Amino acid sequence: MVTLNASSPLTTKSFLPYRHAPRRPISFSPVFAVHSTDPKKSTQSASASVKWSLESWKSKKALQLPDYPDQKDVDSVLQTLSSFPPIVFAGEARKLEDKLGQAAMGQAFMLQGGDCAESFKEFNANNIRDTFRVLLQMGVVLMFGGQLPVIKVGRMAGQFAKPRSDPFEEKDGVKLPSYRGDNINGDAFDEKSRIPDPHRMVRAYTQSVATLNLLRAFATGGYAAMQRVSQWNLDFTQHSEQGDRYRELANRVDEALGFMGAAGLTSAHPIMTTTEFWTSHECLLLPYEQALTREDSTSGLYYDCSAHMLWVGERTRQLDGAHVEFLRGIANPLGIKVSDKMVPSELVKLIEILNPQNKPGRITVIVRMGAENMRVKLPNLIRAVRGAGQIVTWVSDPMHGNTIMAPGGLKTRSFDAIRAELRAFFDVHDQEGSFPGGVHLEMTGQNVTECVGGSRTITYNDLSSRYHTHCDPRLNASQSLELAFIIAERLRKRRLGSGNLPSSIGV
C-alpha cells in the first residue's frame, strides 16, 4: 500500500525487524517432480502434510523458469537480493487482505490494472504518472457510480516476468529462446539478448523500488487529493467523449466538496488528501520471489515483500507444482487466474491448499475465459466454491480470453469483446446471487493503439501507428476510462436493486 499516515497499521515495530532467511548461501538447485503434475491427482491433505519452508518449492516440478548458464552467478545474485530491504511491508499486505475481504462480501470493488509487462526501456516518471492518473480517474468513476470503496491495485513495480506457451521463437528460419520478460532476458531477436541473465533481477528490483517510491509520492504528496479530481484529465482525452463525461463527473465532485466546505466539514482529512494504492504481479520467477520473502516479526508469518499481492497464472497453477507450493506458505493476499479449462473440483482443491483457514480476502479468483464460456463455466465454479463454504473475491479479467491476431499480424483485442465478457461476468453474478468483486485490466496511461474499438474507433489499420507493447495489447487511457463508465453504470444498477434488468447501454 502506498499511503503512510497516522491511520496506517504499520507501527515502528513492523517497519524494522524483518527476519531474513537464514544466512546460508542460497542455492538454486535443480527442481524436479516428486508427484504427478496432473492436478486431479493432488489433494489438499497431501500438500498440507508436508512442512512448508522457503525452499520446499524446489522439491516440486517448476514450470516456466529460465535455464541460467552460470549457476554460481545465479547464487551470487540471489544472495545479494536476499540482503536487500523489502520493497513492501507486511502490514500493508494485511490491510489489502482486509479490503479484499470486504470486496468478497460486496462491500468494495477492486480495480487492478497496469502494463502487460513492465520494461526497462520504457521506465520513466511520465509513464508511471500517466498510468497512476488513469487509475485515479477510473477509481473516481467507479466509486461515484457504485457508491463503494474502490481498492486500487497496480500491475506495477514488479510485473516483469511473462509465461510463454512455447519456449522457443522462430523468425525467418532462425530459432531462439522466447523472450520471458526484462527481468530474465532481452526482447531483441538475437542470441545474446535471449540468454537468461540473473543480473536482470537486480535491475528489476531497483526499478520496482523506484516505481513504488514515485507512487508513494504521488499518493501522499497532494497529487492524489480529491480536490484535484478535475485536473487529472490527460491532454489527449480532454476533447473526447470520455473526457467530457469525466469532466462532468469531476464538476459534480467539486460541487460536493464545496458543499462540505460550506457546511464546515474539513477537506484536510487524509482520506481526502491521499489515496491507498497497492502493487501486484504474477508470481512466476520463484528464485527472485524466494529471495525477497521475509519473516514478519509481528506475526511470525512469511511475506513475499516484492509486492502486496501476487497471483498464480493459468500455466503454473498445478496443485502439486512448485508455484502453488511456494504460495501456500506466504501470507500475502493471492490471486488465482482461472480460464475455461478450470474444473470446479480442481478450483475448490486449489483454494483449500492456498487458504486452509478460509480467511476472507486471502483468495481472489481472477476469471479470464471469454463471454460465451463465462456464461457456461462461471456459474459452476461459483456453485462449487459456495458449496464448499469457501470465501473468495470474484474478479473479471476480460483481456486474456479475447486476444486475437489482426490481419496485419499484430496481436490485438476488441473493445466490444472485452465489454461483452464484463457483461457476462455481471450477468452471472446477478443470476447466482454472488458478488462481482473487481476487474483486472492490462492498460496504460499512454495514447497507444493496441486494442481495436472504443468510442474513438481504433481500427486494424490504426494499430501500427502507436503499437508499443512488449507483450500483449493494452487498453489506452481513453478506452480504460470508457470501460470504467460502463462498469460504473452496472454497479449503479446493482446498488439500486435493478442489476437483473437488461441494460440498454454499457454493460
From Swiss-Prot:
EC category name: transferase
InterPro entries xref list: Aldolase_TIM, DAHP_synth_2
One Pfam family cited in the UniProt record for this chain: DAHP_synth_2
Protein name in the entry: Phospho-2-dehydro-3-deoxyheptonate aldolase 2, chloroplastic
Alphabetized UniProt keyword annotations: Amino-acid biosynthesis, Aromatic amino acid biosynthesis, Chloroplast, Plastid, Transferase, Transit peptide
GO MF terms, alphabetically ordered: 3-deoxy-7-phosphoheptulonate synthase activity
Organism: Arabidopsis thaliana (Mouse-ear cress)
Subcellular location: Plastid, Chloroplast
Record's signal peptide: none
PANTHER family, A to Z: PHOSPHO-2-DEHYDRO-3-DEOXYHEPTONATE ALDOLASE 1, 2, PHOSPHO-2-DEHYDRO-3-DEOXYHEPTONATE ALDOLASE 2, CHLOROPLASTIC
The organism's taxonomic lineage, starting at the top: Eukaryota, Viridiplantae, Streptophyta, Embryophyta, Tracheophyta
One example of a Gene Ontology biological process annotation: chorismate biosynthetic process
